[in-house]
Amino acid sequence: MNKLKQYECTVIIDGGLQDDAIAAAMELVKKTITDQGSVINNVLEVGRRKMAYLIGKSSVGYYAHIEFDAAPSAIAEIERVFRYEENILRFLIIQLSSPLLEMRKRVEKYSVMLGSPEDQAEPESESTAKS
């Protein structure tokens, strides 16, 4: 058995579809990944966004980002299914390298230490808010 490696996939689904069709396409994406013996770690559904250029006749796409562990041999089959699915406009699967994973850990560590800009903002007092 091949050792599992970490991958991330960004998918653009036709944004002109109804919500239930987009949900069905997302389920197909997840099912395709898990059917190959892969384990999904994280799914981030960004939602509908205007694309920089037309793909086919679509100007709006539904963006999703999936992180998963898979055997290298499974990637070709996942790509084959995505390529022939008409509702998937574009996709990109990349293998996460060690330097990228180390950088992500450092960014997470420092963002936890420093906090977000919203955490550092001073709350408005009632007197300043009314002025």
From Swiss-Prot:
GO terms for molecular function: small ribosomal subunit rRNA binding; structural constituent of ribosome. Binds together with bS18 to 16S ribosomal RNA. It comes from the Bacteria. PANTHER family: MITOCHONDRIAL 28S RIBOSOMAL PROTEIN S6, SMALL RIBOSOMAL SUBUNIT PROTEIN BS6M. One of its GO terms (biological process) is translation. Belongs to the bacterial ribosomal protein bS6 family. Keywords: Ribonucleoprotein, Ribosomal protein, RNA-binding, rRNA-binding. Pfam families: Ribosomal_S6. This is Small ribosomal subunit protein bS6. GO terms for cellular component: cytoplasm; ribonucleoprotein complex; ribosome.
